[in-house]
Amino acid sequence: MSASVSPLAPKHYPAMPVIHGVRIATAAAGIKYKGRTDLMLMVFDRPAEAAGVFTRSLCPSAPVDFCRRNLVHGKARAVVVNSGNANAFTGLKGREATQATAEAAAKAIGCATTDIFLASTGVIGEPLDAGKFSHLLGDMAESATEDFWTEAAKAIMTTDTYPKVATETVLLGQVPVTINGIAKGAGMIAPDMATMLSFVVTDAPIKADALQSLLSKGVGSTFNSVTVDSDTSTSDTLMLFATGTAAERGAPEITDAADKRLADFKKALGRVLKSLALQVVRDGEGARKMVEVEVTGAKSAASAKKIALSIANSPLVKTAVAGEDANWGRVVMAVGKAGEPADRDRLAIWFGDIRVAHQGERDPAYSEDATSAYMEGEDIRIRVDLGIGRGKATVWTCDLTKEYVAINGDYRS
């Protein structure tokens, strides 16, 4: 957790409503950080429906492997998250640490280890000593409360400068249901199937298979469309849980993601996921500017997204944004190197509402002064139209500053 809060941090945080059936506790275990919480326990009073997406890294952490195995059962009684150590690339010791943590949590809750989900975030390659915190889980289970969402978000932070929370309330049938989410992430952000760590809970009575479909579809335009540094973590975990307690108030049980009664819920879930994903980008390590990259006129949506990510991940584009330099030539470069269909002589580029390039050359009306003034803002929009199709995509990133280098150069110090 950084000593100074990102200038892109939210000015206000939402009041996080209670979701019946889930309670949360945090603790300071001293895993890496001193003087702050670094352990979070989420308890479901009754088995909750569970869905998840995880990193596609071929070097996944021990907790990711553990979660994948347990997700087959589709039920959850608890989630344990530690920060300061990723428990990744830790071999047998890592697997033993996950098992010890799961057994301690299962004992504290009174359930099987197959109902436990785990996540760890922090340094890769250092063995995790579960003995530092497993003994705390019993007291945490007893003291857990329904209104600890923001504190939970703080406990899972690493180099984050602020907690990331989001909430939505929407009607399912005629009954209000709530969706709450927390996330962490500031570096090693280029998710592929998930984000760094994010946990979303609803009281809607939605079965696991339907939840999984909703989540898998929802990540495409949210968490899978953000990047800070193009590095996909070994620990990426995004989980969605449903306590189902809204059924007690008359909410209908949903078993199929195609159920038309889910229309408003899907939109609300999308807003929660997008809010959390963009908060991660806005807290990118050392970030001073948020960047939206929109690509239109591509051969396909998939092609548009690859080109958008080529722009968003380009160190030259990102440093130009950091330096408030209207260097649109670097955008041309990033389009050209993406390996996707493009026609130089049909290409158009905008910074904000200012068209800077058109039909293979600088726009005749280009104004360096106007474009440079635009680059001084905190929120930068780069739009590219390829003019060869109807495919479109939007991704989000941040600038690349000297602070990013300093943070990561000193990460293990």
From Swiss-Prot:
Active site: T195
Claim: Cytoplasm is one of the keywords in the record: yes
InterPro entries: Arg_biosynth_ArgJ, ArgJ-like_dom_sf, ArgJ_beta_C
Site feature location: Involved in the stabilization of negative charge on the oxyanion by the formation of the oxyanion hole: T121, G122
GO cellular component term, pick one: cytoplasm
Biological or metabolic pathway of the protein: Amino-acid biosynthesis; L-arginine biosynthesis; L-ornithine and N-acetyl-L-glutamate from L-glutamate and N(2)-acetyl-L-ornithine (cyclic): step 1/1; Amino-acid biosynthesis; L-arginine biosynthesis; N(2)-acetyl-L-ornithine from L-glutamate: step 1/4
Site (Cleavage): residue numbering on this chain: A194, T195
Localization terms from the record: Cytoplasm
Entry's EC annotation: 2.3.1.35, 2.3.1.1
Main location as per UniProt: cytoplasm
NCBIfam families associated with the record: ArgJ, PRK05388.1
Family (UniProt): Belongs to the ArgJ family.
Summary of the function given for this chain in its UniProt record: Catalyzes two activities which are involved in the cyclic version of arginine biosynthesis: the synthesis of N-acetylglutamate from glutamate and acetyl-CoA as the acetyl donor, and of ornithine by transacetylation between N(2)-acetylornithine and glutamate.
Complex and partners: Heterotetramer of two alpha and two beta chains.
Record's protein name: Arginine biosynthesis bifunctional protein ArgJ
Annotated organism of origin: Brucella abortus biovar 1 (strain 9-941)
